Amino acid sequence: MNTIHVDVVSAEESIFSGEARFVALPGEVGELGIYPRHTPLISRIKAGSVRIEKADGSEEFVFVAGGLLEVQPNCVTVLSDTAIRGKDLDEEKANAAKLAAEEAMKNAKTDIDLARATSELAVMAAQIAALRKYRQKK
């Protein structure tokens, strides 16, 4: 069977390391699908879910808050400041953080505050969408 080695790493820990048949993730300009022997590629990724179809046919979901992707013919590496396993996502916390970001946008006094709040809101919205996608696949 043709597989590709996949590593998903956050600033704190290795989230996933193993063999996969396919990886789908949110590239900066659209969804990327990676199969074994893919052409080498380096790209930024945006907040969203990484779907890994493991060698045994099961799926692993990981939320990433953006980061970098490196693809080699036999290896995929995803580097993200924040990465959370699908099973560890907490909808209540994500919704609370989304509301806090919306409030911060309303109360922003500078362009920097507004940009920070807007970025946080986008990440929380992506996290909630990733959680819903994970639950649908379960």
From Swiss-Prot:
Q: To which protein family does this belong? A: Belongs to the ATPase epsilon chain family.
Q: Which InterPro entries match?
A: ATP_F1_dsu/esu_C_sf (IPR036794), ATP_synth_F1_dsu/esu (IPR001469), ATP_synth_F1_dsu/esu_N (IPR020546), ATP_synth_F1_esu_C (IPR020547), ATPsynth_dsu/esu_N (IPR036771)
- An MF annotation (GO) of this entry: proton-transporting ATP synthase activity, rotational mechanism
Job description of the protein: Produces ATP from ADP in the presence of a proton gradient across the membrane.
Quaternary form?
A: F-type ATPases have 2 components, CF(1) - the catalytic core - and CF(0) - the membrane proton channel. CF(1) has five subunits: alpha(3), beta(3), gamma(1), delta(1), epsilon(1). CF(0) has three main subunits: a, b and c.
Is tRNA processing among this UniProt entry's keywords? no
Question: Would you tell me the protein name for this molecule?
Answer: ATP synthase epsilon chain
Give me the Gene Ontology terms describing cellular component: plasma membrane; proton-transporting ATP synthase complex
Record HAMAP family: ATP_synth_epsil_bac
Chief site of localization: membrane
Q: Which organism is it from?
A: Albidiferax ferrireducens (strain ATCC BAA-621 / DSM 15236 / T118)
Keyword terms of this UniProt record: ATP synthesis, Cell inner membrane, Cell membrane, CF(1), Hydrogen ion transport, Ion transport, Membrane, Transport
Superkingdom of source:
Bacteria
Q: Which Pfam families match?
A: ATP-synt_DE, ATP-synt_DE_N
Query: Which Gene3D superfamilies does the entry link to?
Result: ATP synthase delta/epsilon subunit, C-terminal domain, F0F1 ATP synthase delta/epsilon subunit, N-terminal
Membrane topology per the record?
Answer: Peripheral membrane protein
Subcellular location per UniProt equals: Cell inner membrane
**Looking at the keywords, is Magnesium present?**
no
